[in-house]
Amino acid sequence: MVSFKAILTLSLIGAAFATPIEQRAAEPVEDSGAVANSPEGSGMDLGGTDPTADAIEERGLLVRNILRQLLNNKQSGLTIISSTSNAITWLSRPPRRGRSLREYPVFQQHHKVYNYNSRPKENPGPFRLIATKDSRHFCGIISHDGIGHNPNAGLFHLCK
């Protein structure tokens, strides 16, 4: 069962980060115009600085899709990430040490939830929600850095 605190936290994250942009496989990440900084930096700016009505509407859609993915999915996530790893210390809400974490794909499409049982596997996209394995407590939104023409490869960085 997901706690009220987790639901409240997720409902408020919409204002905490910019709207993600869709990166086509033919568009290298380094040429996409996205600003990516190291984990020690300020994170990634995934949208423009002018919050138009469309951007605000898309951000609300993204938050609803994140909630749907986290709360309505019967699966427990893609992979286990150790909370003792240095790679996750820069999450916006780091978990206590020793907690197991899972990644959940984040989609921009309305009502899209990742199908873990599809064959061949679906493209999860570069963006991931990180939550604790057992309680699904929200820890942050991260994205792959991308390698060449593949935006789903490479190291992760925090999305703001």
UniProtKB/Swiss-Prot annotation:
Record-listed E.C. numbers: 3.1.27.-
GO cellular component: extracellular region
Alphabetical keyword list: Allergen, Hydrolase, Nuclease, Secreted, Signal
Subcellular location: Secreted
Region annotation (Disordered) ranges: 26-51
Annotated signal sequence range: 1-18
Tree of life domain: Eukaryota
InterPro entries referenced in this protein's UniProt entry, alphabetically: Ribonuclease/ribotoxin (IPR016191), RNase_U2 (IPR048269)
Chief place where the protein resides: secreted
Cystine crosslinks: none
Active site: 103 (proton acceptor), 144 (proton donor)
Entry keyword annotation includes Signal: yes
An example molecular function term from Gene Ontology annotations: RNA nuclease activity
Function: This purine-specific ribonuclease cleaves 28S RNA in eukaryotic ribosomes, inhibits protein synthesis, and shows antitumor activity.
Family the UniProt entry places it in: Belongs to the ribonuclease U2 family.
Protein name: Ribonuclease ARB_07070
Organism: Arthroderma benhamiae (strain ATCC MYA-4681 / CBS 112371) (Trichophyton mentagrophytes)
